[in-house]
Amino acid sequence: SDIIENGPYELEEHVRDIFQTKGLTSKEVMLGIQPLPNQVTRYDTYIYNNSAQYKATPMFKNLLKDDPREEWMLGLLSPKDTIYAITKYVGEKIEECYAIRLTEMYLLKAEATVRAGKDLGDAKEPLKTVMGHAGITDFTKIDAITDRDELLYEIYKETVKNLMFEDGIEWSMLLRFPMEVILKVKPAIREKNYIILPIPAAEFEKNPTIGDQNPGYSKI
């Protein structure tokens, strides 16, 4: 709460401006990274800058249905296309990436408030603030929620809409849910071991006393 209330950062009035015009100069960006000139080509290999490699899944497209962000986050690259591409990163700022934004702090506050067992109204306030800055004006659905698990899932969905294709925070939040919720989003994850990474083999060579490998993996 302190960084939200007393920090030098401000939520961007028009969210798309962060990614398409202002970049790291936006007052919302708390930590951002710009590749050096000799790193741009390598960076472009992995970024979602209108590349045909990155297409919106039906699930993500459905998530943005009737959402103001759909207009600028998804689009057809040509009249012949039938599958929507990710257009969040277009314009002059495609090489800049965002590790931490103030929006994330609001969403973390909302999640922490719910998980701490506090009043749901206190959790809805930062959530609705983020939604409002994204252009949403109807909060009827959020206001009607009385179940903690339901509100947590709405916070997760808003985290995906806001922070997808940035620093992977939406994946971190998903892993904080019970397995049945994770499977709802990622059916391919058939067991808990799928979300646990192995300890690199080199670590066992450097430190023989490190102990056992993580469940589901061998040391070799």
Question: Model segments located where?
Answer:
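Residue-level signal for threonine
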Residues: 56-57, 200
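Active-site-adjacent substrate-recognition loops and nearby beta-strands
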Residues: 42-55
